[in-house]
Amino acid sequence: METLLPDIRYALRMLRKSRGLTIVALLTLALGIGANTAIFSVVNAVLLRPLPYSDSERLVFLSESSQQIPDMSISMANFDDWRSTNTVFEGMAAYRTQNVVLTGTGEPERLRERQMTASFFPTLGVRPILGRVIAQEEDKVGAERVVLLGDGFWTRRFGRDPNVLGRKLILDGEAYTVIGVLPNQEMHGLWRRTDVFTSLWRQEDQMGGAARRGEHPGMYAMARLKSGISIEKARAEMKRIAGGLAQKYPDTNRGTSAETIPLLQAYVEDVRPPLLFLLVAVGLVLLIACGNIANLLLARGTQRYRELAVRRALGAGNWRLIRQSLTESLVLSLLGSALGLLLAGWLTKGFASLYYASVPRLDETSMDRTVLLFTLGLSILTGLFFGILPALQATRADVHQALQEGGRTGAVGASGRLRNILITAEVALSLVLLAGAGLMSKSLYLLLRADGGFNPAHVLTASFSLPDAAY
């Protein structure tokens, strides 16, 4: 530790002395580490960060499955049996999403509606910031129509007016009474984009035959595990219950089972492979950058061969030379990481401002503590990775040869071989990336050129939201 500060000062002097090399290395590191940090911030927000609900690891997603359809919506009658016979969940709720049209006040507006059972918010552990949630007596056919507002819709349509409770909203031609407003921070993740929340069973009188066993009206379920119950045990029990229903109702349930997976996994499983692929791709780019920087440092080490030999002659041991060289590499890497953080911060803000329905939680991307720790660890590993070969090269300085031959000849052979190996590795990694990019480009080209069976020229599409009661 006594020599750490002198080593850092010496490293900074050497970096100033080789300004061209330093600038190239810093820019290379900034791009490599910045890209890795930016992509990891997305991976962290989408895949790693827990859902913003109490004990979210106990929340699971439930669906039905068959040999033909591995993940399908749930029959309402089956859901009733699941909820009444299971022993592994302390709460279970069903829900579905659709679009409704708001009329009656101001301009008509198409809204995203979540229809759910009364157990939905208690199961999640979410409480409204105004009013209350749907009561059990309101969660049945013939009950009064009530609605909760999402924070975004409340802000956009009512200017966060606290007197919104009790107002009437006309949704698809039916009057609903506003009973509550949900907090924005609790709705991040799964249902942040939902505008209004209504009773699912209240809609049963509008579903007709869709409410019968064997019908699947786009409804799914989620549940909260009891304390101490593993997801494996819950999965086994749900399959047992589904098997019993298949025997009891063979006409509608034969060949169907139940699927139980963590709620977060269900939400992000479609985007996990492409995000991890992107993380691997930018990791390969950083490896190539490390190879480039290692080559630069090896070339500079050849020029410093006589200096290193003299230091050995004055008593510097191998470990001392390695430590000095690694310190210089780590200082360079940390400086490059600082620049990379600036780039990553700019990219992260761009990601957070985007909204893609196919990438959930993308707007939650941020430079939090996990991302900063990742960047710090990555910068240290990067510095060690591209600095180890130049550090080992420093121990090869031969005192007698350097003094007799003027300094550089003895280092050329070993250094040249190492640099050739690095160049070969860089080319190999570059070919892997180019091949992957080429395959993806070809797939996109074929997809765009695929024959849809009709001529799409001058053809437009339109969608209409029709009320369930009338259609």
Residue ranges and their predicted role:
Residues 1-22, 263-268, 296-323, 327, ...:
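Alpha-helical transmembrane segments of integral membrane proteins
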Residues 37, 41, 45, 151-152, ...:
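Transmembrane alpha-helix boundary and packing residues in multipass membrane permease domains
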Residues 32, 280-290, 381-385, 431, ...:
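Hydrophobic transmembrane alpha-helices
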Residues 267-285, 370-374:
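N-terminal membrane-entry
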Residues 51-99, 216-222, 447, 451-471:
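Membrane-proximal extracellular/periplasmic loop immediately following the first transmembrane helix
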Residues 40, 331-352, 434-437:
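Hydrophobic alpha-helical transmembrane segments that constitute the membrane-spanning cores
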